[in-house]
């Protein structure tokens, strides 16, 4: 009996000694990247819907394609920002939330020049909003994360760095982006409109384009520029001259839209 009690005490001692090591091992898995994604994931939505695209050639005709992209919730009432090219021409916009529920959404306003748009998600329940960082103090070489609906695979996470700042990019004769963030975080079709995050899980940009034929050259619109455009899109006098009576202001956990 004495020996048995001694073995039990010894086993208990070693278990208590090993426990902090196990806890530390678990903490090592929960890296800053993991925490950043956990912080931001629920505020990122998948956008999809059918659109008609005009073919070229003698027998040109409109063909139906499945559009896809990503959006970021900036107000708990369901206002989200995305790229205009994601929702341009989509007749019925649908949004899949982080919970897996799919709901309808509508285009509120857009700015074709900057390729930004605001949509309103049809929901009664408040939605999680993204935490906003700033693009005023970005550092070349700092770690960033891209989160989005890459090739239809929802909430795909890729990691990279800020490769350069203040890039001007011409993607077509009629579309020029200015003052972009360049990153080597993988940005694929479907990522458009999704957030570029810093290591704290704060949105520092909206992913918008990749360099065709290149690897590791993607671009994002700086968040400070995004907020300026969104404020204008949701102001009383709209770019498209539509009255909504909404004013956007930044706050600690997102952009609150006041009526």
PLM regions and their residue ranges:
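Serine-dependent protease modules
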Residues: 24-258
């Amino acid at each position: 009996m004495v020996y048995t009690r001694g073995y039990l005490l010894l086993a208990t001692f070693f278990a208590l000694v090993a426990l902090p090591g196990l806890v530390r091992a678990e903490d090592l898995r929960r890296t800053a990247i993991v925490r950043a994604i956990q912080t931001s994931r629920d505020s990122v939505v998948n956008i999809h819907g059918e659109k008609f695209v005009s073919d070229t050639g003698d027998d040109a005709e409109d063909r139906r394609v499945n559009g896809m992209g990503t959006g970021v919730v900036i107000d708990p009432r369901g206002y989200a920002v995305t790229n205009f090219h994601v929702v341009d021409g989509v007749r019925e916009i649908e949004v899949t939330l982080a919970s897996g529920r799919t709901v309808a959404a509508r285009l509120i306003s857009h700015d074709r020049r900057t390729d930004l748009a605001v949509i309103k998600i049809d929901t009664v329940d408040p939605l999680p909003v993204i935490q906003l960082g700033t693009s005023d103090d970005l550092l070349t070489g700092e770690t960033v994360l891209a989160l989005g609906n890459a090739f239809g695979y929802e909430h795909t996470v890729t990691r990279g760095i800020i490769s350069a700042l203040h890039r001007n990019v011409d993607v077509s004769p009629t579309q020029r982006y200015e003052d972009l963030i360049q990153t080597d975080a993988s940005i694929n079709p479907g990522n458009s409109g999704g957030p570029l995050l810093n290591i704290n899980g704060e949105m520092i940009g909206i992913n918008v384009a990749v360099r065709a034929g290149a690897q590791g050259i993607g671009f994002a619109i700086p968040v400070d520029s995004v907020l300026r455009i969104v404020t204008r899109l949701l102001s009383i006098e709209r770019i498209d001259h539509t009255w909504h009576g909404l004013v956007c202001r930044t706050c600690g956990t997102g952009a609150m839209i006041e009526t």
